[in-house]
Amino acid sequence: MKTALLLKTKSQPFDPYVEAFEKYGRDTAFIPVLRHKRVHEEQLRDKLKNVRKTYCGLIVTSQRVSETLDEALKQEDETERQKILMETPIFTVGPATDDSIRRLGFQQTHGKDCGRGEVLADLIEEWYTTTKQHKPLLFLVGEKHRDIIQRKLGDDRVDSLIVYATQELENTETQIKDTIRKHPTIDWIVAFSPTSICSLLNTFELKIATIGPTTGDYLKKLGTQPNVVSPAPNPESLASSIVAFDEENSS
């Protein structure tokens, strides 16, 4: 069974990329390249305590934020926690994030089929028009994030809070080489973010994929042409694109 090496931390307790690749008869291996540290935890808890009074909903666009939100919700009184889960609309940017949010227990999710921030921003604008809401949305983000949603919707509709910071891990190159040596079935390496290891991807003699255009463009600037740039930043799109490339280029 061929294996895709994903340069990301494996999500717990369930990583949707495993299932997506298994669907196409492929295995997955994971190597984290970033360390994630929760920040502004007290501010997040304070905002959650008043979330239904202050905001008309939440925006979550990554599984890392979903995990941070889960930890914050565990600090809430069970009655209040259930009210938040049942009554708070929450916008996600694709099926992977939507699934992680639903696993937390949120009932009112929107944006599963959006795929990109620009599309989600349009959906939110339509939602505001339909529901006639006047309160802003609480947008939970990482330290490094694209601001397309905030720019399109404006500060009066989006209140952003950084809930985690990232730092590149050391010795990633050595870990990748060791993993490739131990697992000769690895034929793809997938980059999920613009990090220093991207400058070395073409030295591993594997096919290269990226989760989206931001990382894809970063690789091109470094002189590396990815074989696949996933059309949408989600597991199904990535896995199907890799399989399609292999089928088109099989001898």
Curated annotation (Swiss-Prot):
Under catalytic activity, the entry for this protein gives: hydroxymethylbilane = uroporphyrinogen III + H2O
Q: Which UniProt keywords apply?
A: Heme biosynthesis, Lyase, Porphyrin biosynthesis
The enzyme's main class, written as a single word, is lyase
The record's InterPro entries line, in alphabetical order, gives:
4pyrrol_syn_uPrphyn_synt_sf, 4pyrrol_synth_uPrphyn_synth, UROS/Hem4
Cited function: Catalyzes cyclization of the linear tetrapyrrole, hydroxymethylbilane, to the macrocyclic uroporphyrinogen III.
Tell me its family. Answer: Belongs to the uroporphyrinogen-III synthase family.
Protein name per the record: Uroporphyrinogen-III synthase
**What is this organism's lineage?**
Eukaryota, Fungi, Dikarya, Ascomycota, Taphrinomycotina
Give me the gene this protein comes from: ups1
